């Protein structure tokens, strides 16, 4: 009798709160270090023979990242899932990978024009396109509290990104505007990615590791063609030959990305893309603090007020925001 009760007792992993806590902590730890490595690679000055240069190979960086992500997902499937079948349509993985890598390349490229805290707060808008496209395409319905929380996030991000006109038109202002456009493109593609992922989990019950593997394999294929066609990969190899110390940071960057993506796709499968986008946003405040402390990026009082609004909205969402009432896949 006692043995029967013990056998029927659910495992700790079946507890939704435990599962969510593991996903959140995994995302937080992995992407905190990921963000530091990203800024170290893309914003550092590299000096060779008295000449300074910047890292300008965002596409190749994402290409390497996708290879490591796919390899890691394959290992997870091999050791933990065995012969479990995946019935998801291949074209859905292809569409998801195109929007996913487009968002990533745009976001990484934006770092060449804006500092990391600006990029992070800009990407904090991610729940907005995920919600909008979910409502318009998948016919999701959210409670009013959810929309209020999103409004607070939008207002906070707008305050953070706003810069008063100092009365002169400089190239810096133009460059900042281009960075904003890259962030906007990245957010739109994030929303499309969320819609496709929601459809896959609802229609095909796609597993986290299979989603991670196939999305990254498609991304590797597309990016491999892109970097070979443009010749960027050869310029990247020449750059690493001049600065071999960067290879260590790139490998660490790829490993932290793979670990972080494991928790990201677990969150998508178990809790949905909107919850995942909110999780990835809440950890950004600590990423910003880390960037400010380590790299000396200055944040104004208005930007701090915007930051407070962003995370006030996220806090209210955690307390009052409910799951969508209806989803049509």
From Swiss-Prot:
Q: Name one GO molecular function term.
A: UDP-galactose transmembrane transporter activity
Subcellular location(s): the record lists: Endoplasmic reticulum membrane
> Where is the motif Di-lysine motif annotated in this sequence?
325-329
GO cellular component, as recorded = endoplasmic reticulum membrane; Golgi membrane
Where are its TM segments located?
21-41, 60-80, 91-111, 142-162, 175-195, 220-240, 250-270, 292-312
Outline what the protein does.
Probable sugar transporter.
As for family, the record states: Belongs to the nucleotide-sugar transporter family. SLC35B subfamily.
| Protein name as it appears in the record | Solute carrier family 35 member B1
Organism field: Danio rerio (Zebrafish)
């Amino acid at each position: 009798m006692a043995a029967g009760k013990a056998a029927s007792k659910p495992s700790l992993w079946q507890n939704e709160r435990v599962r969510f806590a593991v996903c959140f902590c995994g995302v937080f730890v992995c992407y905190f270090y990921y963000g530091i490595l990203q800024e170290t690679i893309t914003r550092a000055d590299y000096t060779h023979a008295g000449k300074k240069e910047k890292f300008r190979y965002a596409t190749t960086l994402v290409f390497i990242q996708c290879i490591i992500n796919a390899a890691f997902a394959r290992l997870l499937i091999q050791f933990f899932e065995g012969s479990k079948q995946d019935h998801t349509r291949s074209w859905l993985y292809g569409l998801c990978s195109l929007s996913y890598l487009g968002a990533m390349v745009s976001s990484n490229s934006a770092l060449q024009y804006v500092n990391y805290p600006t990029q992070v707060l800009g990407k904090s808008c991610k729940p907005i396109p995920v919600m909008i496209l979910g409502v318009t395409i998948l016919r999701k319905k959210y409670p009013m509290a959810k929309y209020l929380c999103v409004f607070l996030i939008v207002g906070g991000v707008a305050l953070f990104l706003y810069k008063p006109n100092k009365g002169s038109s400089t190239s810096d202002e133009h460059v900042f505007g281009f960075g904003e456009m890259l962030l906007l493109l990245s957010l739109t593609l994030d929303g499309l990615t969320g819609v496709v992922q929601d459809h896959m989990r609802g229609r095909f019950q796609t597993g986290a590791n299979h989603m991670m593997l196939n999305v990254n394999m498609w991304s590797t294929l597309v990016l491999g063609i892109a970097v070979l066609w443009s010749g960027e990969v050869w310029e990247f190899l020449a750059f690493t030959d001049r600065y071999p110390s960067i290879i260590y940071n790139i490998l660490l960057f790829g490993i932290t990305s793979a670990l972080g993506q494991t928790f990201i796709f677990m969150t998508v499968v178990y809790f949905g893309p909107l919850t995942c986008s909110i999780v990835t946003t809440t950890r950004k405040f600590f990423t910003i603090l880390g960037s400010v402390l380590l790299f000396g990026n200055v944040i104004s009082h208005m930007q701090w007020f915007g930051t407070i609004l962003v995370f006030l909205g996220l806090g209210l969402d955690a307390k009052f925001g409910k799951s969508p009432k209806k989803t049509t896949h």
